[in-house]
Amino acid sequence: MEIVIKRNDRVLVADVKKQLSDIYMKITWREIANQYFGKSSSWLYHKLDGIDGNGGRGGFTQEELATLKDALVDLSERIHTAADRL
């Protein structure tokens, strides 16, 4: 079940960490935050935990969620390419 929060005409998805539970501990989130978002790892960890910048409830905007999806797809393709070279 996806948790959606509406705030100031923005829709935020707040349960992304749960949706990524099977890979959460395997990913270097610092690199994802820096390379794909241009943000700090703490920013991304807060987003994954459904916390906004002020400590309240928040999450990913639809645009940020699309960026995260693209980052994970890119990473999966790079892993597949590396495996094919073996």
Language-model regions, residue ranges each:
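Alpha-helix C-capping/helix-to-loop hinge sites
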Residues: I23, R30, I51-G55
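DNA major-groove recognition helix of helix-turn-helix/homeodomain DNA-binding modules
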Residues: F60-I79
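Recognition helix of helix-turn-helix/homeodomain-like DNA-binding domains
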Residues: S40-G58
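Short, amphipathic alpha-helical "recognition" segments used to contact nucleic acids or chromatin
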Residues: N8-M25
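Short alpha-helical "recognition helix" segments of helix-turn-helix
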Residues: T28-Y36
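Terminal non-globular linear segments
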Residues: K17, S21, S76, H80-R85
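Short, charged recognition helix plus adjacent turn
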Residues: K6, R10, D52, F60, ...
